[in-house]
Amino acid sequence: MERPLRVPEQENDGGACWACLKHKRACDRALPWCKVCREHGIKCTGYEVRLSWPDDIIAKKRQRPEPNHHRRQSSSKSTQSPSSTTSSTRSDKRAMPSVISALNLPAEQSFYMQHFLQNIARVALAIDHQGNGYRSLLPMAMAEPAVLNAALAVAASHHSRWQHTADDVSRKYLGLACKALRNRFIDPKLRNSPVTLASMLLLVSYEVFSGSSRWKGHYDAIRGWIRGRQGNKDLDSFLMNWVCLIDTQSALNLGTSTMPELDEWMSAAPNNQDYTVDSLFGCSSQLPKLMSAASRLYVASKQDLVDEDDIRYQADNLQKRIRSTQLPEDSQIKVGLACTDASQEFSTTVGMERDELRRRAMATAEIFRHASHIYVYRIAHGPMEPLSPEAQESLETALTLLTRVPDALGPGANLGWCLVVLGAELDLEEQREYINSRWAGMHLLGIYNTKNGQSILNEVWNRRDLVSSGFADPERWQDTMQRIGQSQILV
Protein backbone atom coordinates (compact mmCIF):
# COMPACT_ATOMS: atom_id res chain seq x y z
CA MET A 1 0.00 0.00 0.00
CA GLU A 2 1.48 3.33 -1.05
CA ARG A 3 1.49 6.29 1.33
CA PRO A 4 1.58 9.30 -0.98
CA LEU A 5 0.14 11.70 1.58
CA ARG A 6 2.23 12.37 4.66
CA VAL A 7 0.19 13.36 7.70
CA PRO A 8 2.37 15.41 10.05
CA GLU A 9 1.03 16.49 13.42
CA GLN A 10 1.02 19.83 15.18
CA GLU A 11 3.56 19.96 17.98
CA ASN A 12 2.37 19.57 21.54
CA ASP A 13 5.05 17.96 23.69
CA GLY A 14 4.07 19.67 26.93
CA GLY A 15 1.29 17.25 27.82
CA ALA A 16 -1.35 19.98 28.11
CA CYS A 17 -4.80 19.99 26.57
CA TRP A 18 -5.09 22.35 23.62
CA ALA A 19 -7.10 24.91 25.60
CA CYS A 20 -4.48 25.12 28.38
CA LEU A 21 -1.75 25.28 25.75
CA LYS A 22 -3.48 28.20 24.06
CA HIS A 23 -4.05 30.07 27.33
CA LYS A 24 -0.62 29.09 28.74
CA ARG A 25 -2.06 27.39 31.82
CA ALA A 26 -0.70 24.47 33.83
CA CYS A 27 -2.87 21.60 32.62
CA ASP A 28 -3.63 18.75 35.05
CA ARG A 29 -3.94 16.20 32.17
CA ALA A 30 -7.09 14.71 33.68
CA LEU A 31 -9.12 12.30 31.54
CA PRO A 32 -11.37 12.60 29.68
CA TRP A 33 -11.39 16.40 30.21
CA CYS A 34 -9.01 18.78 31.94
CA LYS A 35 -10.26 20.07 35.32
CA VAL A 36 -8.33 23.33 34.92
CA CYS A 37 -10.53 24.29 31.98
CA ARG A 38 -13.65 23.54 33.99
CA GLU A 39 -12.39 25.74 36.84
CA HIS A 40 -11.91 28.58 34.36
CA GLY A 41 -15.40 28.08 32.94
CA ILE A 42 -14.35 26.97 29.48
CA LYS A 43 -14.81 23.74 27.56
CA CYS A 44 -11.71 21.55 27.42
CA THR A 45 -10.74 20.95 23.78
CA GLY A 46 -9.01 17.67 24.61
CA TYR A 47 -5.58 16.16 24.06
CA GLU A 48 -6.12 14.68 20.63
CA VAL A 49 -3.48 14.94 17.94
CA ARG A 50 -4.08 17.85 15.58
CA LEU A 51 -2.99 17.61 12.02
CA SER A 52 -0.95 20.22 10.21
CA TRP A 53 -1.58 20.03 6.49
CA PRO A 54 0.79 20.90 3.64
CA ASP A 55 0.40 24.43 2.30
CA ASP A 56 0.26 23.28 -1.30
CA ILE A 57 -2.85 21.19 -0.62
CA ILE A 58 -4.55 24.07 1.18
CA ALA A 59 -3.67 26.35 -1.73
CA LYS A 60 -5.43 24.05 -4.17
CA LYS A 61 -8.65 24.50 -2.25
CA ARG A 62 -8.28 28.28 -2.31
CA GLN A 63 -7.72 28.28 -6.06
CA ARG A 64 -10.80 26.15 -6.80
CA PRO A 65 -13.57 28.22 -8.44
CA GLU A 66 -16.62 28.71 -6.29
CA PRO A 67 -19.68 26.70 -7.45
CA ASN A 68 -22.66 28.69 -8.74
CA HIS A 69 -25.01 27.50 -6.00
CA HIS A 70 -22.90 29.45 -3.49
CA ARG A 71 -23.85 32.67 -5.28
CA ARG A 72 -27.53 31.79 -5.02
CA GLN A 73 -27.12 31.30 -1.30
CA SER A 74 -25.37 34.63 -0.75
CA SER A 75 -28.61 36.60 -0.54
CA SER A 76 -29.98 34.32 2.16
CA LYS A 77 -26.88 34.85 4.27
CA SER A 78 -27.74 38.49 4.81
CA THR A 79 -31.05 37.49 6.38
CA GLN A 80 -29.51 35.20 8.98
CA SER A 81 -30.00 36.14 12.61
CA PRO A 82 -27.00 37.14 14.75
CA SER A 83 -27.41 33.95 16.79
CA SER A 84 -27.18 31.75 13.70
CA THR A 85 -24.11 33.67 12.55
CA THR A 86 -22.48 33.13 15.92
CA SER A 87 -23.36 29.45 15.79
CA SER A 88 -21.87 29.21 12.31
CA THR A 89 -18.68 30.87 13.53
CA ARG A 90 -18.39 28.38 16.35
CA SER A 91 -18.89 25.53 13.89
CA ASP A 92 -16.14 26.91 11.66
CA LYS A 93 -13.69 26.83 14.55
CA ARG A 94 -14.40 23.14 15.00
CA ALA A 95 -14.31 22.40 11.28
CA MET A 96 -12.20 19.69 9.73
CA PRO A 97 -8.70 20.76 8.67
CA SER A 98 -8.73 22.36 5.24
CA VAL A 99 -7.25 19.36 3.43
CA ILE A 100 -10.34 17.31 4.24
CA SER A 101 -12.59 20.02 2.85
CA ALA A 102 -10.36 20.10 -0.22
CA LEU A 103 -11.13 16.44 -0.72
CA ASN A 104 -14.86 17.25 -0.84
CA LEU A 105 -16.17 15.28 2.12
CA PRO A 106 -19.61 16.37 3.35
CA ALA A 107 -19.75 18.01 6.77
CA GLU A 108 -20.81 14.93 8.73
CA GLN A 109 -18.20 12.74 7.09
CA SER A 110 -15.56 15.41 7.65
CA PHE A 111 -16.41 15.49 11.34
CA TYR A 112 -16.13 11.74 11.79
CA MET A 113 -12.99 11.46 9.67
CA GLN A 114 -11.44 14.13 11.87
CA HIS A 115 -12.43 12.10 14.92
CA PHE A 116 -10.85 9.00 13.38
CA LEU A 117 -7.57 10.76 12.59
CA GLN A 118 -7.26 12.78 15.78
CA ASN A 119 -8.70 10.50 18.45
CA ILE A 120 -9.12 6.89 17.35
CA ALA A 121 -5.70 6.86 15.69
CA ARG A 122 -4.30 8.03 19.00
CA VAL A 123 -5.89 5.51 21.38
CA ALA A 124 -6.17 2.41 19.17
CA LEU A 125 -2.47 1.64 19.41
CA ALA A 126 0.18 1.75 22.12
CA ILE A 127 2.46 4.50 20.82
CA ASP A 128 1.10 7.35 18.75
CA HIS A 129 4.04 8.47 16.64
CA GLN A 130 4.69 10.19 13.35
CA GLY A 131 4.42 6.94 11.42
CA ASN A 132 0.99 6.09 12.86
CA GLY A 133 -0.50 3.55 10.46
CA TYR A 134 -4.10 4.50 11.16
CA ARG A 135 -3.49 7.98 9.75
CA SER A 136 -1.74 6.52 6.72
CA LEU A 137 -5.12 5.05 5.74
CA LEU A 138 -6.38 8.53 4.80
CA PRO A 139 -5.30 8.48 1.12
CA MET A 140 -6.83 5.03 0.70
CA ALA A 141 -10.06 6.14 2.37
CA MET A 142 -10.33 9.15 0.08
CA ALA A 143 -10.14 6.87 -2.96
CA GLU A 144 -12.03 3.78 -1.79
CA PRO A 145 -15.65 3.79 -0.49
CA ALA A 146 -15.18 0.53 1.42
CA VAL A 147 -12.35 1.96 3.53
CA LEU A 148 -13.94 5.39 3.89
CA ASN A 149 -17.30 4.09 5.12
CA ALA A 150 -15.70 1.50 7.40
CA ALA A 151 -13.55 4.20 9.01
CA LEU A 152 -16.57 6.49 9.37
CA ALA A 153 -18.56 3.66 10.98
CA VAL A 154 -15.77 3.07 13.51
CA ALA A 155 -15.53 6.80 14.22
CA ALA A 156 -19.27 7.41 14.57
CA SER A 157 -19.75 4.43 16.87
CA HIS A 158 -16.78 5.40 19.02
CA HIS A 159 -17.82 9.04 19.23
CA SER A 160 -21.26 8.10 20.57
CA ARG A 161 -19.71 5.96 23.32
CA TRP A 162 -17.13 8.61 24.12
CA GLN A 163 -19.79 11.29 24.49
CA HIS A 164 -22.46 8.96 25.99
CA THR A 165 -24.94 9.78 23.24
CA ALA A 166 -27.21 7.57 21.15
CA ASP A 167 -25.52 5.93 18.18
CA ASP A 168 -27.89 6.66 15.32
CA VAL A 169 -25.26 7.15 12.60
CA SER A 170 -22.68 4.37 12.55
CA ARG A 171 -25.01 1.69 11.17
CA LYS A 172 -25.55 3.77 8.06
CA TYR A 173 -21.83 3.82 7.31
CA LEU A 174 -21.46 0.19 8.35
CA GLY A 175 -24.06 -0.84 5.78
CA LEU A 176 -22.36 1.20 3.06
CA ALA A 177 -18.98 -0.30 3.95
CA CYS A 178 -20.34 -3.86 3.82
CA LYS A 179 -22.00 -3.20 0.48
CA ALA A 180 -18.79 -1.78 -1.00
CA LEU A 181 -16.81 -4.69 0.42
CA ARG A 182 -19.24 -7.20 -1.07
CA ASN A 183 -18.77 -5.57 -4.47
CA ARG A 184 -15.01 -5.91 -4.10
CA PHE A 185 -15.33 -9.64 -3.46
CA ILE A 186 -17.49 -10.03 -6.57
CA ASP A 187 -14.82 -8.41 -8.76
CA PRO A 188 -11.75 -10.71 -9.12
CA LYS A 189 -9.53 -7.70 -9.85
CA LEU A 190 -10.45 -6.04 -6.56
CA ARG A 191 -10.82 -9.07 -4.32
CA ASN A 192 -7.13 -9.51 -3.46
CA SER A 193 -6.32 -5.82 -3.15
CA PRO A 194 -4.87 -4.46 0.14
CA VAL A 195 -7.91 -2.17 0.15
CA THR A 196 -10.10 -5.21 0.77
CA LEU A 197 -7.95 -6.22 3.75
CA ALA A 198 -7.99 -2.70 5.22
CA SER A 199 -11.79 -2.63 4.96
CA MET A 200 -12.18 -5.96 6.75
CA LEU A 201 -9.76 -4.92 9.50
CA LEU A 202 -11.77 -1.77 10.14
CA LEU A 203 -14.92 -3.88 10.42
CA VAL A 204 -13.14 -6.02 13.02
CA SER A 205 -12.29 -2.84 14.94
CA TYR A 206 -15.90 -1.67 14.75
CA GLU A 207 -17.06 -4.81 16.57
CA VAL A 208 -14.14 -5.06 19.00
CA PHE A 209 -14.44 -1.41 20.05
CA SER A 210 -18.17 -1.98 20.62
CA GLY A 211 -17.44 -4.94 22.89
CA SER A 212 -19.18 -7.31 20.47
CA SER A 213 -18.09 -10.86 19.57
CA ARG A 214 -19.16 -10.35 15.94
CA TRP A 215 -15.55 -9.50 15.09
CA LYS A 216 -14.91 -13.25 14.71
CA GLY A 217 -16.98 -13.46 11.53
CA HIS A 218 -14.95 -10.69 9.92
CA TYR A 219 -11.71 -12.27 11.08
CA ASP A 220 -12.66 -15.66 9.65
CA ALA A 221 -13.04 -13.85 6.32
CA ILE A 222 -9.59 -12.29 6.75
CA ARG A 223 -8.04 -15.70 7.42
CA GLY A 224 -9.63 -17.07 4.26
CA TRP A 225 -8.53 -14.00 2.30
CA ILE A 226 -4.89 -14.44 3.38
CA ARG A 227 -4.85 -18.13 2.54
CA GLY A 228 -6.45 -17.52 -0.83
CA ARG A 229 -3.89 -15.05 -2.18
CA GLN A 230 -0.32 -15.44 -3.33
CA GLY A 231 2.38 -13.59 -1.38
CA ASN A 232 2.29 -10.44 0.70
CA LYS A 233 4.72 -8.12 -1.06
CA ASP A 234 2.01 -5.59 -1.83
CA LEU A 235 0.77 -5.44 1.79
CA ASP A 236 1.71 -2.56 4.03
CA SER A 237 3.55 -3.61 7.19
CA PHE A 238 0.97 -1.85 9.37
CA LEU A 239 -1.87 -3.91 7.87
CA MET A 240 0.19 -7.07 8.36
CA ASN A 241 0.89 -6.14 11.98
CA TRP A 242 -2.79 -5.41 12.53
CA VAL A 243 -3.66 -8.92 11.31
CA CYS A 244 -0.97 -10.43 13.56
CA LEU A 245 -2.30 -8.61 16.63
CA ILE A 246 -5.83 -9.93 16.09
CA ASP A 247 -4.62 -13.44 15.25
CA THR A 248 -2.32 -13.65 18.28
CA GLN A 249 -4.92 -12.27 20.68
CA SER A 250 -7.58 -14.61 19.33
CA ALA A 251 -5.31 -17.61 19.79
CA LEU A 252 -4.06 -16.63 23.26
CA ASN A 253 -7.55 -16.00 24.60
CA LEU A 254 -9.69 -18.57 22.80
CA GLY A 255 -7.25 -21.47 22.60
CA THR A 256 -7.16 -21.56 18.81
CA SER A 257 -4.17 -22.01 16.52
CA THR A 258 -2.50 -19.01 14.94
CA MET A 259 -2.12 -18.84 11.18
CA PRO A 260 1.21 -20.40 10.13
CA GLU A 261 1.48 -17.84 7.32
CA LEU A 262 1.93 -15.08 9.89
CA ASP A 263 5.09 -16.55 11.43
CA GLU A 264 7.00 -15.49 8.35
CA TRP A 265 5.52 -12.01 8.61
CA MET A 266 6.66 -11.64 12.22
CA SER A 267 10.16 -12.96 11.50
CA ALA A 268 11.03 -9.59 10.00
CA ALA A 269 11.35 -7.91 13.41
CA PRO A 270 14.84 -6.46 14.05
CA ASN A 271 17.07 -8.22 16.55
CA ASN A 272 16.77 -6.94 20.07
CA GLN A 273 20.02 -4.99 20.00
CA ASP A 274 17.91 -2.20 18.50
CA TYR A 275 15.47 -2.38 21.44
CA THR A 276 12.49 -1.75 19.19
CA VAL A 277 8.99 -1.46 20.67
CA ASP A 278 6.06 -2.47 18.49
CA SER A 279 3.87 0.62 18.29
CA LEU A 280 0.67 -1.38 17.75
CA PHE A 281 1.09 -4.12 20.38
CA GLY A 282 3.06 -2.06 22.92
CA CYS A 283 5.65 -4.79 23.56
CA SER A 284 9.10 -5.60 22.22
CA SER A 285 8.87 -6.16 18.48
CA GLN A 286 10.29 -9.65 19.07
CA LEU A 287 7.59 -10.68 21.54
CA PRO A 288 4.54 -11.14 19.22
CA LYS A 289 6.03 -14.19 17.49
CA LEU A 290 6.78 -15.69 20.93
CA MET A 291 3.22 -14.97 22.05
CA SER A 292 2.11 -16.82 18.92
CA ALA A 293 4.32 -19.75 19.93
CA ALA A 294 2.78 -19.63 23.42
CA SER A 295 -0.71 -19.90 21.93
CA ARG A 296 0.29 -23.00 19.96
CA LEU A 297 1.75 -24.54 23.11
CA TYR A 298 -1.51 -23.79 24.92
CA VAL A 299 -3.48 -25.57 22.17
CA ALA A 300 -1.14 -28.58 22.38
CA SER A 301 -1.58 -28.70 26.16
CA LYS A 302 -5.34 -28.25 26.07
CA GLN A 303 -5.87 -30.94 23.44
CA ASP A 304 -3.33 -33.37 25.00
CA LEU A 305 -1.34 -33.44 21.77
CA VAL A 306 1.94 -33.92 23.69
CA ASP A 307 2.74 -35.39 27.10
CA GLU A 308 3.16 -33.29 30.23
CA ASP A 309 6.97 -33.57 30.35
CA ASP A 310 7.29 -32.32 26.79
CA ILE A 311 4.93 -29.42 27.54
CA ARG A 312 7.14 -28.34 30.45
CA TYR A 313 10.29 -28.72 28.36
CA GLN A 314 8.86 -26.56 25.58
CA ALA A 315 7.57 -24.05 28.14
CA ASP A 316 11.03 -23.71 29.70
CA ASN A 317 12.60 -23.07 26.29
CA LEU A 318 9.93 -20.51 25.47
CA GLN A 319 10.53 -18.75 28.80
CA LYS A 320 14.20 -18.32 27.88
CA ARG A 321 13.28 -16.78 24.54
CA ILE A 322 10.78 -14.43 26.19
CA ARG A 323 13.44 -13.43 28.73
CA SER A 324 15.75 -12.43 25.86
CA THR A 325 13.32 -9.67 24.83
CA GLN A 326 13.96 -7.72 28.04
CA LEU A 327 14.51 -3.99 27.58
CA PRO A 328 17.30 -2.67 29.84
CA GLU A 329 16.36 0.28 32.01
CA ASP A 330 18.71 2.67 30.19
CA SER A 331 18.03 1.45 26.63
CA GLN A 332 17.26 3.99 23.92
CA ILE A 333 14.19 2.38 22.44
CA LYS A 334 13.05 2.79 18.87
CA VAL A 335 9.56 2.47 17.44
CA GLY A 336 8.72 -0.15 14.85
CA LEU A 337 6.48 -3.07 13.97
CA ALA A 338 6.87 -6.82 14.34
CA CYS A 339 6.30 -7.29 10.60
CA THR A 340 9.09 -5.08 9.31
CA ASP A 341 12.83 -4.81 9.86
CA ALA A 342 12.58 -1.03 9.71
CA SER A 343 12.47 1.07 12.84
CA GLN A 344 12.58 4.77 13.55
CA GLU A 345 13.82 7.00 16.30
CA PHE A 346 11.45 7.38 19.20
CA SER A 347 9.06 10.26 18.60
CA THR A 348 5.91 11.50 20.26
CA THR A 349 2.75 13.19 19.07
CA VAL A 350 0.65 12.55 22.15
CA GLY A 351 0.31 15.31 24.75
CA MET A 352 3.18 14.12 26.92
CA GLU A 353 6.86 14.93 27.30
CA ARG A 354 9.08 12.71 25.21
CA ASP A 355 11.05 11.27 28.14
CA GLU A 356 7.86 10.51 30.06
CA LEU A 357 6.34 8.73 27.07
CA ARG A 358 9.57 6.78 26.61
CA ARG A 359 9.45 5.65 30.26
CA ARG A 360 5.82 4.59 29.88
CA ALA A 361 6.52 2.76 26.63
CA MET A 362 9.41 0.83 28.18
CA ALA A 363 7.35 -0.02 31.28
CA THR A 364 4.45 -1.22 29.10
CA ALA A 365 6.76 -3.41 27.01
CA GLU A 366 8.16 -4.97 30.17
CA ILE A 367 4.67 -5.52 31.59
CA PHE A 368 3.84 -7.45 28.41
CA ARG A 369 6.99 -9.53 28.84
CA HIS A 370 6.22 -10.41 32.46
CA ALA A 371 2.59 -11.19 31.59
CA SER A 372 3.86 -13.53 28.86
CA HIS A 373 6.10 -15.30 31.39
CA ILE A 374 3.07 -15.90 33.62
CA TYR A 375 0.90 -17.00 30.67
CA VAL A 376 3.47 -19.62 29.63
CA TYR A 377 3.92 -20.76 33.23
CA ARG A 378 0.19 -21.44 33.50
CA ILE A 379 0.28 -23.60 30.36
CA ALA A 380 2.49 -26.08 32.19
CA HIS A 381 0.90 -25.66 35.63
CA GLY A 382 -2.66 -25.73 36.94
CA PRO A 383 -4.56 -22.46 37.47
CA MET A 384 -4.37 -22.63 41.28
CA GLU A 385 -0.85 -24.04 41.66
CA PRO A 386 1.46 -21.61 43.50
CA LEU A 387 3.67 -19.55 41.21
CA SER A 388 7.33 -20.47 41.01
CA PRO A 389 9.78 -17.90 42.47
CA GLU A 390 10.53 -16.65 38.95
CA ALA A 391 6.85 -16.33 38.03
CA GLN A 392 6.08 -14.64 41.35
CA GLU A 393 8.87 -12.16 40.69
CA SER A 394 7.36 -11.44 37.27
CA LEU A 395 3.97 -10.80 38.87
CA GLU A 396 5.37 -8.44 41.50
CA THR A 397 7.57 -6.61 38.99
CA ALA A 398 4.67 -6.16 36.57
CA LEU A 399 2.44 -4.74 39.32
CA THR A 400 5.20 -2.29 40.23
CA LEU A 401 5.67 -1.30 36.59
CA LEU A 402 1.94 -0.56 36.31
CA THR A 403 2.51 2.44 38.57
CA ARG A 404 4.85 3.87 35.92
CA VAL A 405 1.97 3.81 33.46
CA PRO A 406 -0.54 5.54 35.75
CA ASP A 407 -3.39 6.07 33.28
CA ALA A 408 -4.73 5.17 29.86
CA LEU A 409 -2.90 8.00 28.11
CA GLY A 410 -0.49 6.60 25.52
CA PRO A 411 0.84 3.07 26.11
CA GLY A 412 -1.54 2.53 29.03
CA ALA A 413 -4.39 2.18 26.53
CA ASN A 414 -3.14 -1.25 25.43
CA LEU A 415 -2.80 -3.07 28.75
CA GLY A 416 -6.13 -4.95 28.77
CA TRP A 417 -4.67 -8.41 28.09
CA CYS A 418 -1.94 -7.86 30.66
CA LEU A 419 -4.48 -6.82 33.30
CA VAL A 420 -6.38 -10.08 32.78
CA VAL A 421 -3.25 -12.27 32.92
CA LEU A 422 -1.86 -10.50 35.99
CA GLY A 423 -5.22 -10.05 37.69
CA ALA A 424 -6.02 -13.76 37.40
CA GLU A 425 -3.23 -14.39 39.94
CA LEU A 426 -4.47 -11.95 42.59
CA ASP A 427 -6.37 -12.78 45.77
CA LEU A 428 -5.84 -9.68 47.93
CA GLU A 429 -8.81 -7.31 47.87
CA GLU A 430 -6.68 -4.16 47.64
CA GLN A 431 -4.83 -5.54 44.62
CA ARG A 432 -8.10 -6.39 42.91
CA GLU A 433 -9.43 -2.91 43.64
CA TYR A 434 -6.33 -1.43 42.04
CA ILE A 435 -6.82 -3.49 38.89
CA ASN A 436 -10.47 -2.41 38.74
CA SER A 437 -9.37 1.22 39.03
CA ARG A 438 -7.16 0.65 35.98
CA TRP A 439 -10.13 -0.75 34.08
CA ALA A 440 -12.15 2.34 35.00
CA GLY A 441 -9.48 4.56 33.47
CA MET A 442 -9.42 2.51 30.27
CA HIS A 443 -13.21 2.65 29.93
CA LEU A 444 -12.89 6.42 29.44
CA LEU A 445 -11.32 5.74 26.05
CA GLY A 446 -14.68 4.55 24.72
CA ILE A 447 -13.23 1.25 23.49
CA TYR A 448 -15.44 -1.23 25.25
CA ASN A 449 -13.50 -4.46 24.88
CA THR A 450 -12.05 -3.21 28.18
CA LYS A 451 -15.47 -3.79 29.75
CA ASN A 452 -15.33 -7.36 28.48
CA GLY A 453 -11.91 -7.73 30.08
CA GLN A 454 -13.16 -6.46 33.43
CA SER A 455 -16.20 -8.75 33.45
CA ILE A 456 -13.97 -11.74 32.62
CA LEU A 457 -11.59 -10.90 35.44
CA ASN A 458 -14.36 -10.37 37.98
CA GLU A 459 -15.74 -13.81 37.14
CA VAL A 460 -12.22 -15.28 37.46
CA TRP A 461 -11.98 -13.80 40.95
CA ASN A 462 -15.38 -15.18 41.90
CA ARG A 463 -14.22 -18.61 40.77
CA ARG A 464 -10.93 -18.35 42.69
CA ASP A 465 -12.82 -17.44 45.86
CA LEU A 466 -15.14 -20.42 45.41
CA VAL A 467 -12.17 -22.74 44.82
CA SER A 468 -10.46 -21.43 47.95
CA SER A 469 -13.66 -22.16 49.90
CA GLY A 470 -13.92 -25.65 48.45
CA PHE A 471 -17.07 -24.98 46.42
CA ALA A 472 -15.65 -25.21 42.88
CA ASP A 473 -12.89 -26.77 40.82
CA PRO A 474 -9.96 -24.68 39.51
CA GLU A 475 -10.44 -23.15 36.07
CA ARG A 476 -8.13 -21.29 33.69
CA TRP A 477 -9.16 -17.74 32.91
CA GLN A 478 -9.51 -18.67 29.23
CA ASP A 479 -12.05 -21.34 30.19
CA THR A 480 -13.86 -18.87 32.43
CA MET A 481 -13.99 -16.46 29.52
CA GLN A 482 -15.68 -18.99 27.27
CA ARG A 483 -17.96 -20.30 30.03
CA ILE A 484 -19.54 -16.87 30.46
CA GLY A 485 -19.89 -16.44 26.70
CA GLN A 486 -17.08 -13.94 26.19
CA SER A 487 -14.75 -14.07 23.19
CA GLN A 488 -12.83 -10.89 22.85
CA ILE A 489 -9.62 -9.23 21.72
CA LEU A 490 -8.31 -7.80 24.99
CA VAL A 491 -5.52 -5.49 23.72
Identify what each model region corresponds to.
Residues 200-209:
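Internal, conserved structured core segments that host functional sites
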Residues 1-191, 210-418, 422-491:
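Intrinsically disordered, low-complexity activation-like regions
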